């Protein structure tokens, strides 16, 4: 009985020390991780609109999204106080899930798409982040249906990923379209 009690106390102490160490490491690394994410996000925005000198956050002005798709950010890209485009970042289900950043011109065309995260099957679903799949969206209207088989050529063997990407794009871009329409077709 005495050995059992001693073992329980020692095990409890190890557990407490491990939890405290984990909490310390988490509190130390969390701000660093957040800074790296913010820096990567800024770099991604700048790569879509390299001429932009500022990005105005408009996430709070967008409508709500139903379903599994989450909007993380939305910005108006500006150059010398002139709107030159917009970006929206959305996450949603594919075969696993994807986070996509989309650039949009002021005449409602897609400039480029960047996958910030794509956790689908390597060599199948991961082809969504490669040409020719990703390139087919360039210069498409944001009012496109993004229907796989009609407007979007699916990746062979990764139809679920293709449909997921198309759904994420359609949902995110419909919010941008509504936003622009509510301002007379302009971003501000």
List where the protein language model places each region:
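Flexible, solvent-exposed loop/hinge segments and secondary-structure transition points
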Residues: 2-188
């Amino acid at each position: 009985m005495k050995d059992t009690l001693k073992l329980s106390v020692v095990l409890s102490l190890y557990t407490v020390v491990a939890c405290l160490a984990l909490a310390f490491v988490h509190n130390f690394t969390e701000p660093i991780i957040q800074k790296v994410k913010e820096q990567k996000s800024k770099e991604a925005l700048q790569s879509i609109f390299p001429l932009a000198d500022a990005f105005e956050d408009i996430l709070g002005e967008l409508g709500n999204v139903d379903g599994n798709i989450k909007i993380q950010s939305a910005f108006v890209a500006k150059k010398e106080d002139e709107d030159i485009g917009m970006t929206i970042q959305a996450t949603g289900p594919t075969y696993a899930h994807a986070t996509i950043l989309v650039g949009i011109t002021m005449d409602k065309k897609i400039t480029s798409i960047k996958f910030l995260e794509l956790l689908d099957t390597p060599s199948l679903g991961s082809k969504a982040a490669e040409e020719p799949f990703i390139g087919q969206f360039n210069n498409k209207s944001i009012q496109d249906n993004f229907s796989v088989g009609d407007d979007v050529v699916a990746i062979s063997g990764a139809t679920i990923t293709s449909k997921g990407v198309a759904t994420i794009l359609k949902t995110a871009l419909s919010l941008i379209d509504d936003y622009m329409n509510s301002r007379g077709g302009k971003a501000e």
